């Protein structure tokens, strides 16, 4: 079988980017096909640790903060594969991780949260947001589905 990937990238220290349909979620934020969107470029060891920990094991779930205020400065979005409990169908959904002013991370796999962040970007431009944007976590229900969204807190 012929290798369809770039041999130079595979045989070097560079990361080979393999295009997939999962990257459609990321294309709303950037034209890059890295498999994720992160609003900051980690430069220091501390920033790299923040990114790693946020992706590997976020501090809390958004569901645990319904009705509470978070001051969002950064966001990470990555596609994840979810199996539908009813149909068994595997589908790609956005995992959204919000980062607050103190570096705490809040995550959910949610198109509602993803769409809320897209709207924030349309209005407030791309993060990092300094100062942060105060938001209140909301949960809506449609049938048996929970939908997370954000309200901007007006001061």
Regions found by a protein language model. Give the residues of each.
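OB-fold ssDNA-binding interfaces and closely related basic DNA-contact patches used
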Residues: 2-101, 143-144, 149-155
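A composition-driven signal for long, intrinsically disordered, charge-rich low-complexity tracts
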Residues: 34-35, 110, 132
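Short nucleic-acid-contacting surface segments enriched for D/E, G, S/T with interspersed K/R
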Residues: 65, 116-136
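Disulfide-stabilized netrin-like
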Residues: 97-125
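Short, exposed beta-strand-loop hairpins at the edges of beta-sheets
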Residues: 138-142
